Every structure is written in structure tokens, then in C-alpha cells.
């Protein structure tokens, strides 16, 4: 537990005090946000605000993870490093997108195909590696399994299609999760502090979930219990979640309205990758849909808006994603953010309740 606390505290301090230094560096180089003319008029005042703040979040999390292990003498694990790899890899894709937007002074960076290709490449590397590195003394458990998981692995095993077929299907499944979550966080990042605060809540949930899994691990109990968790390295996954959570919390101080800096795609894709990696390796893939319910609602608003317009020529919302609909309805930005945070918090509490109830009841 000490490693978890150190990781969270260290990343918070680095992010809190490192962000203003990064802001000044960005301002000197003129790296400011480009705002579309067809967006909400209230956003025009945000033009020129420093962006690519995700760089601070990523660096703070990486430094905190390393420092926590250095201070406690604990060894990093493959599971923890894989989540950080996925987070950093998607962050690089987002950084390229942000940099092109700034350089070209337009709202489009990477093409949609290039962006998806980058996300896909990073996701494939993560998924393939996650099925490698069997642990000695843990029945050869790999960081990920080919089972579809809800609150833990279910009997639905993709390996039923053979070793090769199961691996291919798992990679596809992991890509779907990674792409959906990273793009969901990206769509949510439209108002000051919204995505940062919502993601912090989900990461806090994973600190609790992975810590609980560690205390009830099939590999640490002296007597194996029927409801133990066959998760590889759950304690280190909690360390990663704490490191990223602390980084987000420190960044939120500067990202809250009126934002002094935006995380950009660098941050939103990276945070989505961290959540996806934690869900896959902690065997809570479907639970993430509930924990990240706000991201799901916002993504659905875009899907419904696009689908309705293509089929009927009419829009369901005044503007999508959903937060912009309420902006055009006259809600203040801070009001929307706080209410959406409340919704995000309710989803997180509900998800944690379902997770704990499953363990208590054995259902």
C-alpha cells in the first residue's frame, strides 16, 4: 500500500508544480489551441490557450511509478509496464495530432485513418505482449487472458478457436476496447476540466479495485478461496492507477475553468489508453462500461447525432458531443462540468457497488 500512496502523491506534486513551468514554455513558443469557428461561440475566447498538457500527465505518471518502486524497493511488473506502454504509445499518437493542429493552425491534425492506424498499431503491440511473459509460480499466468471479462474472467474463452485464432480474436477485442475508451475520453474533453475530473474518478475506482484484488489474490492467500482473483500483479496495477490519478489531479488545478492549459489529444488518448489497459489486465473489461458511463453517454450522443442526420437529415441534439448541446441550451460551462462530474461519480459508485456485491454474494 505504501507504494500506491507514494505513486499518487509523487505524481500529484510533479503535475501540480510542473504544469505551470510547461505552460510558460508553451506560451514562449506560441503553442496554443486552435478553435473551430463553427463551435460554440463561448469557445472563441479559448483560442491560443496552451495545449498538449497531456505531456505533463504522462511524464508525471512515469516518474511517479519509477520513484515509488525506487523508494520502496518493490520491483516493477510486466503488467504495470504494459499499461504505461499503452498510455504512452497512445499519448504519442495524440501528440502528433496536436502538433499538426498547432503547426497548421487548423482544427484537423492527423487524418482519421492515420489516427486510427496509430491507435491500432499501439493497441496490437500491447495486446500481443499482454499474452506473453508467463509468470513463474503463478501457473504460468500471463498479464492478460483470452477470456472475456465482466467483473472477473467469464467462461467465454476466445482460445476455444485455437491458439492462433484465440490470440487473433483477443487482439481484435483489445483493439475495440482501446479504441472505444480512448476516443470516448477524447470526445469528453470539450470543456475545461471535464475529462480530467471524470477520468480521475474512474482511476480512483481502479486504485480500489486493484488493491482489493491484491488482498484477495489467488496467488497471495495462504488458503485459496473460491472467490479469489486470478489477476496477474494487481498491486502494481493499483500503483499505475494511483500514479495516473495523481497526475490528473495535479493537472486539474490548471485545467479547471478558466483553463490555463488543455490536455489535448496527447492527454485524452493517453488517459483512455490507461483506463483500457487497467480494465483488460484487471479482468474488468465490461465493468469499465459502467465505471466510465459518462464517456459512454457522450460517445452515444455523437453516434446518435451522426446516424440521425445521415438517415433523416435531422439532428437530435443542438450540437454533439452532449456537453455542447447544453452549452447551446444556455447552461454555463462550470454548471455543465460539475453536473457531468456528478453523473460520472454516480457511475463510479454504482460500478464499485456492483464489483463488491459480486464478491460478497458470489453471484
Swiss-Prot record:
Keyword annotations for this protein, in alphabetical order, are: Cell cycle, Cell division, Cell membrane, Cell shape, Cell wall biogenesis/degradation, Magnesium, Membrane, Metal-binding, Peptidoglycan synthesis, Transferase, Transmembrane, Transmembrane helix
Gene Ontology molecular functions: metal ion binding; phospho-N-acetylmuramoyl-pentapeptide-transferase activity; UDP-N-acetylmuramoyl-L-alanyl-D-glutamyl-meso-2,6-diaminopimelyl-D-alanyl-D-alanine:undecaprenyl-phosphate transferase activity
UniProt EC number: 2.7.8.13
How this chain sits in the membrane, per its record, is:
Multi-pass membrane protein
Pathway where this protein functions: Cell wall biogenesis; peptidoglycan biosynthesis
Looking up Pfam families in the UniProt record yields:
Glycos_transf_4, MraY_sig1
Q: Which cofactor does it need?
A: Mg(2+)
Highest taxon listed in the record's lineage: Bacteria
Q: Which CDD domains match?
A: GT_MraY (cd06852)
Residue ranges annotated as transmembrane are 3-23, 55-75, 76-96, 116-136, 158-178, 190-210, 237-257, 261-281, 286-306, 340-360
Q: Where is it found, in Gene Ontology cellular component terms?
A: plasma membrane
Report the catalytic activity: UDP-N-acetyl-alpha-D-muramoyl-L-alanyl-gamma-D-glutamyl-meso-2,6-diaminopimeloyl-D-alanyl-D-alanine + di-trans,octa-cis-undecaprenyl phosphate = di-trans,octa-cis-undecaprenyl diphospho-N-acetyl-alpha-D-muramoyl-L-alanyl-D-glutamyl-meso-2,6-diaminopimeloyl-D-alanyl-D-alanine + UMP
Tell me where in or outside the cell this protein is found: Cell membrane
Q: Which GO terms describe its biological process?
A: cell division; cell wall organization; peptidoglycan biosynthetic process; regulation of cell shape
What function does this protein fulfil? Catalyzes the initial step of the lipid cycle reactions in the biosynthesis of the cell wall peptidoglycan: transfers peptidoglycan precursor phospho-MurNAc-pentapeptide from UDP-MurNAc-pentapeptide onto the lipid carrier undecaprenyl phosphate, yielding undecaprenyl-pyrophosphoryl-MurNAc-pentapeptide, known as lipid I.
| Similarity comment text for this entry | Belongs to the glycosyltransferase 4 family. MraY subfamily.
Q: What is this protein called?
A: Phospho-N-acetylmuramoyl-pentapeptide-transferase
Q: Which organism is it from?
A: Kineococcus radiotolerans (strain ATCC BAA-149 / DSM 14245 / SRS30216)
Which gene specifies this protein's sequence?
mraY
Amino acid at each position: 500500500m505504501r507504494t500506491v500512496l507514494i505513486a499518487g502523491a509523487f505524481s500529484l506534486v510533479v503535475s501540480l508544480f510542473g504544469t505551470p513551468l510547461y505552460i510558460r514554455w508553451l506560451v514562449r513558443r506560441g503553442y496554443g489551441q486552435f478553435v473551430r469557428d463553427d463551435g460554440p461561440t463561448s469557445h472563441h475566447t479559448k483560442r491560443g490557450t496552451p495545449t498538449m498538457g497531456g505531456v505533463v500527465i504522462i511524464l508525471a505518471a512515469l516518474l511517479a511509478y519509477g520513484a515509488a518502486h525506487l523508494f520502496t524497493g518493490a520491483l516493477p511488473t510486466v503488467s504495470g509496464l504494459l499499461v504505461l506502454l499503452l498510455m504512452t504509445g497512445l499519448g504519442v499518437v495524440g501528440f502528433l495530432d496536436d502538433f499538426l493542429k498547432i503547426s497548421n493552425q487548423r482544427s484537423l491534425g492527423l487524418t482519421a485513418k492515420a489516427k486510427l492506424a496509430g491507435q491500432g498499431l499501439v493497441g496490437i503491440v500491447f495486446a500481443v505482449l499482454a499474452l506473453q511473459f508467463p509468470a513463474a509460480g503463478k501457473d504460468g499466468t500471463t498479464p492478460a487472458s483470452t477470456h472475456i471479462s465482466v467483473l472477473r474472467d467469464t467462461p467465454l474463452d476466445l482460445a476455444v478457436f485455437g491458439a492462433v485464432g484465440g490470440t487473433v480474436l483477443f487482439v481484435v477485442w483489445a483493439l475495440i476496447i482501446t479504441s472505444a475508451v480512448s476516443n470516448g475520453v477524447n470526445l469528453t474533453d470539450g470543456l475545461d476540466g471535464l475529462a480530467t475530473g471524470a477520468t480521475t474518478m474512474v482511476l480512483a475506482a481502479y486504485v480500489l479495485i486493484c488493491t482489493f484484488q491484491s488482498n484477495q489474490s489467488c496467488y497471495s492467500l495462504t488458503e485459496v478461496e473460491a472467490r479469489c482473483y486470478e489477476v496477474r500483479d494487481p498491486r502494481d496495477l493499483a500503483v499505475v492507477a494511483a500514479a495516473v490519478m495523481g497526475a490528473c489531479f495535479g493537472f486539474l488545478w490548471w485545467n479547471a475553468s478558466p483553463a490555463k492549459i488543455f490536455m489535448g489529444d496527447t492527454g485524452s488518448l493517453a488517459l483512455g489508453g490507461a483506463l483500457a489497459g487497467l480494465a483488460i489486465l484487471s479482468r474488468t473489461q465490461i465493468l469499465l462500461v459502467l465505471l466510465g458511463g459518462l464517456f459512454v453517454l457522450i460517445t452515444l450522443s455523437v453516434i446518435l447525432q451522426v446516424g440521425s442526420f445521415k438517415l433523416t437529415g435531422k439532428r437530435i441534439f443542438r450540437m454533439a458531443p452532449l456537453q455542447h448541446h447544453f452549452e447551446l441550451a444556455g447552461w454555463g460551462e462550470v454548471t455543465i462540468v460539475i453536473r457531468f462530474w456528478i453523473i460520472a461519480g454516480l457511475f463510479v459508485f454504482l460500478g464499485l457497488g456492483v464489483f463488491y456485491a459480486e464478491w460478497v454474494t458470489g453471484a
